[in-house]
């Protein structure tokens, strides 16, 4: 019994220093475990974001305009737990407002003086190139339309074979046009072995034809485009290839980007003529009616610009009226079926794809771009633009008064002011707000009785909403990660003041354009329960 008492006394004596040490740690650095709450304010600056607008002074057409970013600010609210001495886990929410950026527009001045000489052609200030063609997925309605394309009637019979005669090519013109417009495939291509000759596109020769074959098919098979059965197999094969290689971007977004690019290219000329060019893109969920209205709006603005400059330069520049003649596919207009919502989405995509095909290699748009290039390089363009900005008519002294609204305000787009000094205006490129929720882990690096230095890592989700180019965007949710370094000051018993600097990285782009990566400083008060 005495032995047991001695052992218990020894163990009790050994435990006393350990208990005292634990109490001292709690008194020194506030290292006691337990829950806490934190509230604070945050502010900072935006990094890693670039404008989507090209610099008009860049002849290569690749340099973006500089963005002037604002200083976002907001508040934080968090709850956490000190899980071990010097280590804590935290769940926090941060709200950031004023996530805003502006871009310079209408820039004139010394750079405008470079092109102010009337005796020399105006140097290229920006590259004018129509949007590149984009091949869209072929829908079922497009496929059926292609299958039912007949041959053009002929007066006499010609051979059906690999090498079509001139008359046969004329008979297959509608089918060849379908291949080009819907699949982006040229029927005849230059012969690699003889550049002077042309052969049937090898892509068409690789599409299987005929009934099932037990033996492996030949790599290259004859292509008889005038043969109806052969043509049916050709259309089905081309459709399968199109859908297998279809882009991940929706047809509505492709159409919107093309229209925005065209508006951006013609805007300097439109401003000189006093024509207002919209800046709002198509919403991602645009209806068939919205797509049709947008195409009509594009048609009207391009033709108004053309009409404004008709007669400014020689030849037949700006002489031909622009008529895009966009029509909603009839099969999609009906939009009836058991799955109405899915049918509606399919109709929207089909309408957008049809609109993209109208813009692909559009001869009227290409002609307008060429005429604008001539206008831009004309030796007397500066004087002509100044007259357009000052008069209530076209460059010939007449015209509609409506085309001159605001011309005096926008004359900086055509040349420098009389004093040689220009002005810069700023346009808001985006104005957003963010709600960020993160789980963070903190560890103390250095601890004293009065303060501690800590570092932390976090990960979570960011919810972003607001406007881009003045248009409300669809809310974006994406992954974020952050790193922080801070100082915690022991202000009172259980109360700490956290002064922290952090960086947050976004893994996704808003509207596939902007990656918001802010540097932030925060000031918070933490209370340990």
Curated annotation (Swiss-Prot):
It is found in: Cell membrane. Residues 106-116 have a biased composition (Basic and acidic residues). Gene3D superfamilies: 2.40.160.20. Residues 1-22 form the signal peptide. The keyword Metal-binding does not apply. The chain crosses the membrane at residues 67-87, 477-492. InterPro entries: OMP/PagP_b-brl, TSA. It is a multi-pass membrane protein. GO terms for cellular component: plasma membrane. Residues 106-134, 392-424 are annotated as: Disordered. It comes from the Bacteria. Keywords: Cell membrane, Membrane, Signal, Transmembrane, Transmembrane helix, Virulence. Coiled coil: none annotated. The keyword Signal applies. NCBIfam families: Orientia_TSA56. May be an adherent factor for rickettsial adsorption to the host-cell surface and a determinant of virulence of individual rickettsial strain. It is the major outer membrane protein. This is 56 kDa type-specific antigen.
